[in-house]
Amino acid sequence: MAGYLRAVSSLCRASGSTRTWAPAALNVPSWPEQPRRHYAEKRIKVEKPVVEMDGDEMTRIIWQFIKEKLILPHVDVQLKYFDLGLPNRDQTNDQVTIDSALATQKYSVAVKCATITPDEARVEEFKLKKMWKSPNGTIRNILGGTVFREPIICKNIPRLVPGWTKPITIGRHAHGDQYKATDFVVDRAGMFKLVFTPKDGSGAKEWEVYNFPAGGVGMGMYNTDESISGFAHSCFQYSIQKKWPLYLSTKNTIMKAYDGRFKDIFQEIFDKHYKTDFDKNKIWYEHRLIDDMVAQVLKSSGGFVWACKNYDGDVQSDILAQGFGSLGLMTSVLVCPDGKTIEAEAAHGTVTRHYREHQKGRPTSTNPIASIFAWTRGLEHRGKLDGNQDLIRFAQTLEKVCVQTVESGAMTKDLAGCIHGLSNVKLNEHFLNTTDFLDTIKSNLDRALGKQ
């Protein structure tokens, strides 16, 4: 039944915004589409555009190097550029984030740099109009789909969980729940209720959540059968493609209606559409309680797909990334329900601590590999959609070059720390600074492409 759900409490607030397009002043340069100078005479021609979403802080600086030194010298692609740096999101009242998602729907492929999600400290630092929501959350709620995160395996990088001998892919449901919730602060005694008003005009339903004796906090969140079904189909299809078993984790023993709906929809879709293919591939699907699943993951050898609700996927993907070596070695791709629209991004944040060092003029050793893989996964998908084998080969070659560079002993400090311990590593003996590492990848890529 369609309808309108609202949260009622003793405290309410209204907010509005006006769209403006004043250019933002950034601490680092703003990078519009760059002139095509000094590029190779014969570049791979890409017929259709790719949406580029720029970001913040250290990753923004690295992103520019990747684009200008690793991608555009070899690939002739039209980039539909959107500056998602926090100052520009503030200048445009976050309209630029919405526009970038709509452009992704139009062109089917986007690559995204890491961005800041502001908290109170960031609001003060950037003098923001308001505490803007997560750009990733906004984009994902427009596009729908599932975020699949998988580790990049380098043979010489030891795992914190040595038993993980095979990759573990997390499928994160990128819609609703906490990321599209309405939350608020209660500053006095009062009743918090949820009210659902059916669209067909029938009587409203009301639930009493809590009778506040004093201040506190409240939240209302939602998800939809359509989105959960799309999530399920994506996960089952991905498991069949990988020939790995699939596990769905929820807390349906506590959230009997909410999480129970996830469990029921997955089971119905599996029984109706995928059980035969799973049996044929000798793989299986199971539902697990989230706490039981976390324990099982630590004891496993890997080699499975883990379907997580939105918040669980956000948290557990970072744990897996560190367990496999580093957040800098984790791919992240949002796959939409239509099967052709994707948005590829780095799984980590903007590396603020390194950016503060950069602002002081000090060299950093920041791992760019996840950001490089955002570009390669996006370009590879563009190649698959367009039937462009040269573009696919280029993306795969750049990925292999990154892995082989690390396996040859050239790496950033975070990876060297996995091998030797962070307190024991020395610059130029065990690791390279950011610029030198990127230059090494560039030289190795040129060599692999036969351009040296």
From Swiss-Prot:
Gene3D superfamilies: Isopropylmalate Dehydrogenase (3.40.718.10). Acetylation at Lys-413 dramatically reduces catalytic activity. Deacetylated by SIRT3. Mn(2+) binds at residues 291, 314. One of its GO terms (cellular component) is mitochondrion. Its EC number is 1.1.1.42. It catalyses: D-threo-isocitrate + NADP(+) = 2-oxoglutarate + CO2 + NADPH. This is Isocitrate dehydrogenase [NADP], mitochondrial. It comes from Rattus norvegicus (Rat). The gene is Idh2.
